[in-house]
Amino acid sequence: SVSLNRTDILTDVPQMLISSRGPLALKWNYVPKMVPWFVRFVANCRKEKMMHTAKYMHQILDQSLPAFDELFQDIDLEGLVESKGILYVWTNKSIKSRELEIQIRDELGVKQQLVNPKEIHDLEPNLKPFYDGGVFYDYARHARNPRKILVKLFEKFIEKGGKFLKLNIQNVDFDGELPVLRSEAQRFIFDKLVIACGAFSKRLTDKLHENIPLDTERGYHVHFKGCDHLISRPVVYADRGFGMTPMELSLIHI
């Protein structure tokens, strides 16, 4: 629930960009297009703004596990979801940033267990002991195969009378208080509408005169096949901004 607009992020960004092993890279010819977004981001890198974002992120995330439980009631998840927690580790080089995150989560009432090197080794004995400390969230869960879970949810949605249409939506507006979607040849009226198009959502929200500062972020991952047994749960290396998750038949590095 700690947002990216931390007060210390601006001092970290230059080092992230300079380092070839850093977690951040920019496509330089895209920078001019990013300037309006970046200006708004910098303006929000203040403690009161950070805490505002963290507070409302926490309210959403705090409801996520019960919400998933409700969705999962009608589908068979055997072997697809594991309840083994999530582990964050770090070195003393980034201790100031980690202390800030711990403090914020404490203020929000997040349950967290600080762990020392011995406790980290007990949890994940195959990790090279480069770490100086960490935090463990024992109630967290992870998916072994997100695609299989989504397919099961989709099939249940169709079974319960849901409809799936693949259309090019041209516009979104309102008929009174009811949202309306318009494709090239059809018009749909709904009681409620969720716009969930990822980076392309802005094309539709702009038509509603909602100026959302949404931009794109490209992420990469690597599969290490046959290595899912090396760790028992997701492990995040906070210094470098990447994580590893044991999944079906492979270890995923993000």
Model-identified regions with their sequence ranges:
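Active-site substrate-recognition segment that forms the wall
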Residues: 5-43, 171-174, 178, 187-252
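Helical element adjacent to the flavin cofactor pocket in flavoenzyme catalytic cores
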Residues: 100-106, 130-183, 188-192
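Extended hydrophobic/aromatic segments used for targeting, binding, or gating
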Residues: 97, 112-131, 139
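Short, flexible turn/loop "capping" segments at secondary-structure junctions
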Residues: 80-81, 128-130, 245-247
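Residue-level signal for well-ordered alpha-helical positions
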Residues: 101, 126-127, 207-208
